[in-house]
Amino acid sequence: MLSFKSLLQNPVIKKSLSLFSTDVLVRGANFLLIPVFLHLMTKNDFGVYGYLYNFAMTCSLILNLGYHSALPKLYIETSENRKDNASMLFTLSISLFGFLAFMFALFYITDADYAFFNIVNNSEDVQFDYRSYRPYLFIALASMIFSNFLTYYFISAKKIKNIQAFNLIRMFVCNIAVITVLYLSKDTDKVLLRLSITYVTEFLLCCVFARSFIKEIWCKYRKDYMLRALKIGLPLSFVGLVNSVVNFGDKQFIMLYCGSEAMGAYNLASLLATIPLIVFQSFNFVWLPNFLGEKNLQTLKKKNDRNAKIILSVLLLLSIFIWFGSYLLLQWNIFPRNYGEITSYLPMLLLSQVFAALILYYFNYFTYFEKTHIPMVISVCGAFAGYLLYSLSAEKFGAIGISTSIAVINIAITLLYIIFSNHYIDKRIKATA
């Protein structure tokens, strides 16, 4: 068994700790600011903002063409040839942002987004003016895709300091601006203020940090890189679309059957439940390039199995602390007491996010073997199950029923990922023996 000292000397662990320390500061500060926003916004406003934020985040996972998987893979393959690497970066960025501009124009011409939001607005317990939020929701979507593209570029290029600087500056500038304006505003729509200030500021910061990326590109479009990226990424975009039934469907059913005030509490619980997933992502950001670059399959499997056990144990323990801490914060009125309902369904949401982390972890195998169509098939099955469970549980059991449903779905998907990933690596090991 490895000693604690030898673990700390491992280069992957050391880089993880370096990135994790910044993430702890950034994410920790964002979570510490949750009570500030809870007191600056009404429960209804907090619910509407959370709903719009999750809608934009879900759309970003659908419209990003799966670059978060294609970019690290192609970067490693082209890293030894600077011109190939530079043209690959240019090809992926032009393809992604050209596609995004086309989709934005299409939505503005057809008004398809209005048809979606009218479903929620027909509910008696939900009322908000989507028309006023629309321009800033599109900016938020563009900013999310832009910032994640930069993040995965920095990860692929192993520019850890760039990630740290970007995250720290974004945290300070965006939060200071938003909190100041919300505090000074009295009768203004606080959902609109928070949405607009946060993502206009973030988008401008992305433009500043994109300078280091622009310096690396070579303006030569390569069709072969575009096709490779689409082969890897398009199944993931489809997975994002299908997964939206599970990952955004819970918020949609909460808004439809419980209203925007209940969505405020559910949004708070969902934010707290993402902590285990965020902790995992700090590790995965550093682990992924090393995972994709490992040539010895037996070593890869051994490391992967060991890390999976550690991740599961750490995240379950962390979840217990989060639930207990949330209970204390409610008792001390740091979280307003009208959010007390979260203690009943937060455990299930935490469990669902622990297994969501494992889903992402085992997804690395499908990227490694370029078998990203497998998660696509699994996601379709999960979406059908999710819609069925939400439909049966939402009206009768509310948030408790929905949170239990999403936990069951994520556990089932994790088990399928483990089965298929082990099948492929065992098959490849036998073929190379």
Regions found by a protein language model. Give the residues of each.
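Hydrophobic alpha-helical transmembrane segments
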Residues: 51, 135, 164-213, 381-385, ...
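Signature of the first transmembrane helix
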Residues: 11-68, 72, 101, 108, ...
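Helix-loop junctions and terminal segments of transmembrane helices
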Residues: 63-80, 273-298, 367-368
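Membrane-interface junctions at transmembrane-helix termini in multi-pass inner-membrane proteins
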Residues: 74, 143-165, 293, 351-378
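Interfacial segments at transmembrane-helix termini and the short loops linking adjacent helices
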Residues: 12-13, 112-137, 260, 324-357, ...
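Interhelical loop/hinge segments that connect adjacent transmembrane helices in multipass membrane
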Residues: 1-13, 118-129, 161, 188-195, ...
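Transmembrane helical elements of multi-pass membrane transporters/channels
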Residues: 15-34, 167-174, 191-210, 223-289, ...
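Membrane-water interface segments that mark the loop-to-transmembrane alpha-helix transition
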Residues: 14-26, 52, 61-117, 128-135, ...
